[in-house]
Amino acid sequence: MLTIRGQAQPTIGHLSVRYRGTAAEMNAPALRLRVQRLLGSVDLHPAGLPTGAVLIVRRLHGLAPLPAQSQILPSDWTAHLRAQMRTLYTTAARPALGPVATNATSVLFTDGAEMLACLTRDLLAGLAWQRWYWQHILRDVPKAPGPALAALWSARATQVPAALASLEKTEARHAFALFSLSL
């Protein structure tokens, strides 16, 4: 899973790498560093992504295997990754505008406050743990909605007022009630 926040450095929540070689030949720390350096050299920000926007991508696929000692990504790899990101951005589902299909490959929020409002709404409805795009955010959060809201709102305190303003009054009251019970 890949998260891009406006112009900030992308965050990769989960990365799978297939290594072709023997276990004895594999140096896991060196492989990790090489993959990190290779991916860090690619600008994954899709053109037109507004500053502050949050794009969460379910999967990003590379091309054919790279040579084990690659020091730079070949230009066709870079072009392929950028084209995927462009498509994922332009076809992203918008949770703030309505339900997201279970097979959605990416979701887009206009900013962190919109993302927090949608996450709050899904926690209140008991749906957050079922949504693939919340998994990296909820990884270290308590399962109960009240303590989860307390942890999430505390970590994103500057976004809470705008997030609450976009909720329905009954949703905001319910969220405050759960939040208060968890303190």
Feature map (PLM): residue ranges:
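Short, compositionally biased pre-sequence/patch detector
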Residues: 1-183
